[in-house]
C-alpha cells in the first residue's frame, strides 16, 4: 500500500511539473519536490501515527533550513481511515490523504481540520461580526440557532476559537454569507509555526554523535557555518553559511561524514549530490582518509578540511571540484 501511494505521489508531482528526487529509504522524508519557489519534504505513511518524535523533529529542522514545506501523506490514523478533504496534524506537521494533496495542488484547498472532538473549520471572525451587526442580530440569537454559548460566539468573532463544520454551516445559512476559509497546506511559515529552534535540536543530537562526526561538525562550526546534524536523513549534516538573502540555497552544503568509504557510502553520497543539484546548493563527503577518487562526488579528508580557513574558502573549494569534473 505504501509503495502504491509513493508511486502515485511521484506521478502527481511530475504531472504538476515538479522536479523531484529519487525516493529515499529509512529517512525522515521520502521525497523532495521543487517547483519555482515551492519546496516539499514529503513523508509517505500508511498510518500517520507511526511517525516518531525523532523523525518529526528532524523533518521540521531540515524543512526550516531548506525553506521547504514538510507534509505527511497517508491513508489512516491509529483508530480510523483518514477523511478526504480534511487536514490532520502530527507533531506540528500537516497530514492529508493523497486526494486532498492533489486537490490542493490543483487549486482547491481543504477547509476542514481534525482536532480533539471532531472536525473544525477556520472562519472569518471580522466578517461574522460585521454581518451580524449589519443584520441587527444579537449574539444571543445567533448563539441559540447555532446551539453554542454567547461566549463562544464572541470567541468566533475575535478569531479566538473555531466552530465545528456543522456549526459553521448553520451560521453561514442563517446569515447568508460565506465565512469558512480554506486551509493552505503549502504555506511555508504556517507549516513551521510549531518548529523548535535548530540550536536545541542540534545540541540534543550532538550528544549522541560518534567522535569522528563530532570532529567534523566542530570544524565546520568553527568556520562559521550554521549547522543541523541529522540521523534520519540520507545526509549526516546540513551546513549553512549565514547570509542576508534567503531567496536561494546557494550557500547550503549537504554533508555526509564517514570514517571509511565503501559502496554504500558512495551510493548515498551520489543521492545527496542529486538533492543538492535540485536545490541549487552543494554536497560534500568528508572522510578520515580519501581512497579512490570518484568524479561524481565532491569529497575531502578531514585533514584537508582542517586546512580550510572559513566558509568562503570551503565553498570555493567545492566549486572548483565541481568545475573540474565537468
From Swiss-Prot:
CDD domains per the record? HTH_XRE (cd00093)
Q: Which Pfam families match?
A: HTH_3
Q: Which UniProt keywords apply?
A: DNA-binding, Transcription, Transcription regulation
The entry's protein name is Putative HTH-type transcriptional regulatory protein MmarC5_0898
Q: Which InterPro entries match?
A: Arc_TR_HTH, Cro/C1-type_HTH, Lambda_DNA-bd_dom_sf
Extract one GO molecular function annotation from the record.
DNA-binding transcription factor activity
Domain HTH cro/C1-type, chain residue ranges per copy: 128-183
DNA-binding positions are 139-158
SUPFAM superfamilies, alphabetized: lambda repressor-like DNA-binding domains (SSF47413)
Cross-referenced Gene3D superfamilies = lambda repressor-like DNA-binding domains (1.10.260.40)
Amino acid at each position: 500500500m505504501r509503495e502504491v501511494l509513493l508511486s502515485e505521489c511521484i506521478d502527481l508531482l511530475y504531472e504538476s511539473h515538479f522536479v523531484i528526487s529519487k525516493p529515499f529509504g529509512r529517512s525522515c522524508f521520502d521525497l523532495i519536490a521543487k517547483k519555482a519557489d515551492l519546496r516539499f519534504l514529503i513523508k509517505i505513511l500508511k498510518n500517520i501515527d507511526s511517525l516518531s518524535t525523532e523523525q518529526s523533529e528532524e523533518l521540521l529542522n531540515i524543512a526550516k533550513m531548506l525553506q521547504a514545506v514538510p507534509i505527511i501523506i497517508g491513508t489512516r490514523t491509529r483508530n480510523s481511515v483518514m477523511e478526504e478533504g480534511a487536514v490532520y496534524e502530527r507533531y506540528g506537521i500537516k497530514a492529508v490523504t493523497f486526494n486532498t494533496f492533489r486537490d490542493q495542488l490543483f487549486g482547491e484547498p481543504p477547509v476542514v481540520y481534525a482536532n480533539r472532538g471532531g472536525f473544525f473549520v477556520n472562519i472569518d471572525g471580522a466578517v461574522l461580526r460585521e454581518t451580524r451587526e449589519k443584520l441587527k442580530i444579537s449574539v444571543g440569537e445567533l448563539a441559540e440557532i447555532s446551539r453554542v454559548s454567547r461566549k463562544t460566539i464572541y470567541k468566533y468573532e475575535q478569531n479566538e476559537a473555531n466552530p465545528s463544520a456543522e456549526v459553521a454551516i448553520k451560521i453561514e445559512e442563517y446569515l447568508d454569507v460565506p465565512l469558512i476559509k480554506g486551509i493552505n497546506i503549502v504555506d511555508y511559515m504556517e507549516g513551521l509555526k510549531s518548529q523548535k529552534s535548530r540550536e536545541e535540536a542540534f545540541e540534543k543530537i550532538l550528544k549522541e554523535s560518534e567522535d569522528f562526526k563530532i570532529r567534523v561538525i566542530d570544524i565546520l562550526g568553527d568556520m562559521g557555518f550554521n549547522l543541523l546534524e541529522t540521523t534520519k536523513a540520507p545526509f549526516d549534516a546540513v551546513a549553512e553559511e549565514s547570509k542576508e538573502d534567503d531567496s536561494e540555497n546557494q550557500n547550503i552544503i549537504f554533508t555526509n561524514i564517514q570514517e571509511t568509504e565503501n559502496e554504500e557510502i558512495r551510493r548515498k553520497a551520489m543521492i545527496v549530490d542529486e538533492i543538492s543539484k535540485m536545490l541549487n546548493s552543494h554536497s560534500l563527503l568528508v572522510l578520515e582518509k580519501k581512497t579512490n577518487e570518484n568524479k561524481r562526488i565532491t569529497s575531502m579528508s578531514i585533514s584537508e578540511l582542517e586546512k580550510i580557513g572559513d566558509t568562503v574558502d570551503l565553498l570555493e573549494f567545492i566549486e572548483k571540484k565541481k568545475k573540474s569534473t565537468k
